[in-house]
Amino acid sequence: MLSKTNFIKQPIVHSSVLPLTLMFLKNWILIKLQGTDIIQYLHNQFTCDIKNLNKNQYSFAAHCNFNGRMISNMYVFYINNQKIAFIEPLNIHHKQISIMQKYATFSNVTITPDYNVTLIGASGLYVKKYLNTFFTTLPDTKNMVIHYPGITLLHFKLPIDRFLLIIYDQTILDFLLNKTQSFPIYYNSYHQWTALDIEAGYPYIDFATSELFFPQAANMDILQGISFNKGCYIGQELVARIQHYKLNKQSLYQLTSNTYHNQHNQLPVSGDHIVLRQKNNQIWKHIGTVLQSCQMQEGNICIQAILNKSFIKETEVYFQHNELIYSNINLKILEK
């Protein structure tokens, strides 16, 4: 009998050659909110327009501090008529909830992490055909969120069709995992989903990169995760000023390389600095920060980073973890 233990890390491949794959997204978590004030409360907290969020849609969003810098990013959506939920990186959720609860003191709002749900990603060849054996209707670009008893499905269109399954009922997960005989199906860890997010240009702000960047630096405006027409929210004044005066000097990039020289055998991790040598190799200049990375099956590495826009797009750079400069790499940089 298949279970979550089947989702061990396997070779990571590009979306163009991805077979039908289920991925265990243990690095994400579902946060539920309920109460009579949830709409107004979240509208005053998140960068997106909660008041106009449709029941069949989700929205990219960011939660900022007073300086307009992202505490984290998330996908926010309705899970029923009375509850709103969002999905965010697991390792930031304690900090995130603690900050949000400070502003919920005088509101009828309850914020609860759901540790009992299972988040599964589905993508690759024949993914729609596979899911249609269980669900008559799948979410798409128009109806991005669909609910069934015990499960919610979200659709993501980039870099290829993929689905996030929010499974509330363990028996549904068991059924999905043990009714796959008609399909050649692979099981992988969240690292494959990470690779797809990097391809898609979907940012990942976790504990190590929390409160470092304005949302525009993570392309949240391009992803329609910022409403510039709504009322005030935390950090709104600075976020709006950056947009109005075109002051954003950073952007989200996809970095890829076939050469990776690292004596410590360490991949870049969230929060690592990206630096350049300057002035006869005596001075290190900080030019960016790693958000997430993965090593592909063919050996090259794929990195998501926020870089200064003034950075030269093809050059040799180094990674710095704490005080250790541990590797150099020749990069090809693709802006998303």
Swiss-Prot record:
Binding-site residues, folate: W28, W193
Give the primary localization class. Answer: cytoplasm
Annotated keywords? Cytoplasm, Folate-binding, tRNA processing
Q: Does the keyword Cytoplasm apply?
A: yes
Q: Which domain of life is it from?
A: Bacteria
Q: Where in the cell is it found?
A: Cytoplasm
Q: Which Pfam families match?
A: YgfZ_barrel (PF21130)
Keyword Cytoplasm in record: yes
MF-aspect GO terms? folic acid binding
BP GO annotations: iron-sulfur cluster assembly; RNA modification; tRNA processing
A GO-annotated cellular component = cytoplasm
Family according to the record: Belongs to the tRNA-modifying YgfZ family.
**Function, please?**
Folate-binding protein involved in regulating the level of ATP-DnaA and in the modification of some tRNAs. It is probably a key factor in regulatory networks that act via tRNA modification, such as initiation of chromosomal replication.
NCBIfam families attached to this UniProt entry: PRK09559.1 (NF007110), ygfZ_signature (TIGR03317)
Under what name is this protein listed?
tRNA-modifying protein YgfZ
**Species classification:** Bacteria, Pseudomonadati, Pseudomonadota, Gammaproteobacteria, Enterobacterales
